[in-house]
A protein has these predicted regions:
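Catalytic cores of enzyme domains
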Residues: 3-186
């Protein structure tokens, strides 16, 4: 499984933060999905957050949205995988490509007067760090996820990029999307 054939395509869009919040905030629906996640209420970049989300987002002027789409060759996505093999394929492709974008966004933050990337969930600390620490020990490197802010990723994909969200459901899909973004003030 060393030679996994795939292509990567990236899509970009810039919006004002006011437009972004008004179009894509769907807190109650998104939080329903968050509550099903094993990371819910276990770390300081995932829900629930102790911040005013609208104020946080709109305190910046713009948001750049980057979709990284990993497109698998037909033989790759039609293959049968055990759970461990499927996780291995995803780690060697999707998460590898996601990390490239995250690293670039963290570097890009330095170019603006005020900026913060939305690349969560956080993996810098102990798993379930909320059980260990009463507050985030590394707020300077913690980044929120779009979902923790109540942002509807499915709607972003469809409305801005005309991309349908395909769920994994135990089988590798034809493509996988990661949405990363950076809030900034010039």
């Amino acid at each position: 499984m060393n030679d996994i054939k795939y292509n990567v395509e990236r899509f970009y869009k810039t919006l004002t933060t006011n437009e972004f919040y008004e179009r894509f905030s769907n807190f109650e629906v998104v939080q329903g999905y968050c509550k099903e996640c094993p990371r819910y209420d276990t770390n300081y970049s995932c829900s629930p957050l102790g911040i005013d989300i609208k104020e946080f987002i709109t305190s910046y002027d713009y948001i750049d949205i980057i979709v990284t789409q990993v497109q698998y060759d037909e033989k790759v996505y039609n293959a049968d995988y055990s759970k461990d093999e499927l996780n291995d394929v995803i780690n060697k492709t999707f998460f590898k490509e996601r990390k490239k974008v995250v690293d670039k966004l963290l570097d890009t933050e330095k170019k603006y007067t005020k900026a913060e990337s939305l690349t969560g969930p956080c993996n810098h600390c102990t798993p379930k760090c909320k059980e260990v620490y009463s507050e985030c020990k590394h707020p300077e490197i913690r980044r929120y996820s779009l979902a923790s802010l109540g942002i509807d990723s499915k709607k972003i994909l469809k409305d801005l990029f005309d991309i349908d969200l395909i769920l994994i459901n135990g089988k590798l899909p034809k493509y996988m999307n990661n949405i990363s973004s950076i809030l900034y003030t010039k």
